[in-house]
Amino acid sequence: MTSNAFIAFQKNEETRCIVEAIVEDNPGATVVDQPAMVKVDSPNRLVIKRSTVEEKMGREFDLQELQVHLITISGHLDETDDEFCLSWQS
């Protein structure tokens, strides 16, 4: 059985870049775009790579900045300076 890991953000210009990075690094990810928020689902695992977000934003990015835009997450969280990973493990 596959469970989706997901993350939801407030909808704004910075999160547009973050979502683009997530979709690039998670080929199975699906985006649910709503008026005030954007949610990204990914089967089993969702990873946000600092380097990809920096590439999309055109500036340095600290993964702690995600907290400013974050609404909710689903999955076990594993975080380093370079990756923010949500997953469901059996």
Descriptions of predicted regions:
Residues 34-37, 41-90:
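Helix-rich interaction surfaces within compact, conserved domain-sized segments
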Residues 1-21, 25, 36-56:
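Conserved N-terminal glycine/acidic-rich loop preference
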Residues 26-29, 61:
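A common structural junction motif
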Residues 21, 30-31:
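Short, conserved, surface-exposed binding loops centered on an aromatic residue
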